[in-house]
Amino acid sequence: MSATRKAGSAADVAAAASELRVAASRLLRHLRSARAGIEMTPSQAVALSRLGTDGPLSVADLARAERVRPQSMRTTLATLEERGLVTRAPHPTDQRQVLLSLSDEGRRLLTLAHHAKEDWLATAITTKLSPAEQDSLITAIPLLASLVED
């Protein structure tokens, strides 16, 4: 679907969905590579980011939030803990659980990665889009965000 066509028919919406999927995949690939040289798997980056956003979480809560198996999340978190990026603390009311949170180094690394991604994206927006296109993008952001709200 070209930028000049308007959505309306099921075929137009399907074409738009396909183009958006491709563009989103390419954008994510670029953002993942813009980590300022930080060596981290995508699952490690997501877990670190979720802990930075949502604060201390149990393995089960983190796995549920990211829609992965607890065993997979345990493996990811073990690597982050070995690297000194997350810390463990007992749950205040349930002694069977452990809460994980960012260490100071994890917070520093997460901030560094976010800045690198935002710098790349800001540069791409200002160098590749006209002012009118930038306005259109800004207008579309809430619409895109609403597509992924739970």
Predicted features along the sequence, with ranges:
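N-terminal helix-turn-helix DNA-binding core of bacterial DNA-binding proteins
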Residues: 30-72, 83, 99
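Short, locally clustered residues in the helix-turn-helix/winged-helix DNA-binding domain
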Residues: 49-53, 114, 142
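N-terminal leader segment of winged-helix/HTH proteins
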Residues: 1-42, 126, 146
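Pre-recognition alpha-helix immediately N-terminal to the DNA-recognition helix
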Residues: 26, 46-52, 108, 135
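Exposed, interaction-prone assembly regions rather than primary DNA-binding/catalytic cores
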Residues: 135-150
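Alpha-helical linker/hinge and terminal dimerization helices associated
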Residues: 27, 31-34, 66, 109, ...
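Charged, amphipathic alpha-helical coiled-coil/dimerization segments
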Residues: 78-136
